[in-house]
Amino acid sequence: MTNNVIIRQLGIQAYQLVLVAMQRFTERRKANTIDEIWLVQHPPVFTQGNASESEYLLLIPGDIPVVQSDRGGKITYHGPGQQVMYVMLDLRRRNLLVRDLITILEKTVITTLYKFAITTAYSKKDAPGVYVGDDKICSIGLRIRKGCSLHGLALNIAMDLSPFLLINPCGEVGLRMTQLSRLSPVVYNTTDVVKVLLEVFLSLLGGTNTGAIKTWHYNDYLNNSES
């Protein structure tokens, strides 16, 4: 039970729906609830973490909604072509500290990028995420509730980066964002990357997939039963 993980493919889902579903899944967890990993892309949205402040949003975002989130960190942008991986893990059961999970997520992205010939990716001690040169390619934000994690990472693969110009990403003034398609001469999409991302994460975590990747239905998280 300890190492089992259910993988769910959400496709493209509104951030607000997934946020509520994550919260309800975590609230209803029991000691024997199997951990889950959710793979998703979001329609364009800015999300503000618990540490976000109004000055991090530089310009009026137009048609892109701004959503308050309960994750750690500051403001970021999600959009199609960015692979998001949410990790709902019982950290106590896995004997992991929050810093341990952040390190695993960072190593997951660095190793994944290396497999796609991006060999210079690195992490920073005081700024969770993954960087290439001076630019950021992956953002990480977590929340811990009852010893369990929710939220996760967002890896830029082949997306429109221009909305990042409307904010100070992660609260860092002048921070530029980059993506795999800009750094690699080979064209990759999220399908190419997600298989490697998942394999690397499970290897570092010591997790065992419980079987085929499962579908996800929002209504499952509205009833009173455990998903």
From Swiss-Prot:
Additional free-text comment from the UniProt record: In the reaction, the free carboxyl group of octanoic acid is attached via an amide linkage to the epsilon-amino group of a specific lysine residue of lipoyl domains of lipoate-dependent enzymes.
Disulfide bridge partners, by residue number: none
Keyword Transferase included in the entry's annotation: yes
Biological process annotations from GO: protein modification process
Binding residues for substrate: R71, G72, G73, K74, I75, T76, Y77, H78, S139, I140, G141, G152, L153, A154
Family: Belongs to the LipB family.
Task of the protein: Catalyzes the transfer of endogenously produced octanoic acid from octanoyl-acyl-carrier-protein onto the lipoyl domains of lipoate-dependent enzymes. Lipoyl-ACP can also act as a substrate although octanoyl-ACP is likely to be the physiological substrate.
Pfam families for the chain: LplA-B_cat
InterPro entries from the UniProt entry: aa-tRNA-synth_II/BPL/LPL, BPL_LPL_catalytic, Octanoyltransferase, Octanoyltransferase_CS
Active site location: C170
Record field: catalytic activity: octanoyl-[ACP] + L-lysyl-[protein] = N(6)-octanoyl-L-lysyl-[protein] + holo-[ACP] + H(+)
CDD domains: LipB
EC number(s) recorded for this UniProt protein: 2.3.1.181
The keyword Isomerase belongs to this UniProt entry's keyword annotation: no
Enzyme class of the recorded protein, top EC level: transferase
Provenance organism: Baumannia cicadellinicola subsp. Homalodisca coagulata
Protein name as it appears in the record: Octanoyltransferase
GO molecular function: lipoyl(octanoyl) transferase activity
Pathways involved: Protein modification; protein lipoylation via endogenous pathway; protein N(6)-(lipoyl)lysine from octanoyl-[acyl-carrier-protein]: step 1/2
PROSITE patterns, per the entry: BPL_LPL_CATALYTIC, LIPB
Membrane-traversing stretches: none
Domain BPL/LPL catalytic: 31-209
Cellular component per GO, a single term: cytoplasm
Sites marked Lowers pKa of active site Cys: K136
Gene3D superfamilies for this protein: Bira Bifunctional Protein, Domain 2 (3.30.930.10)
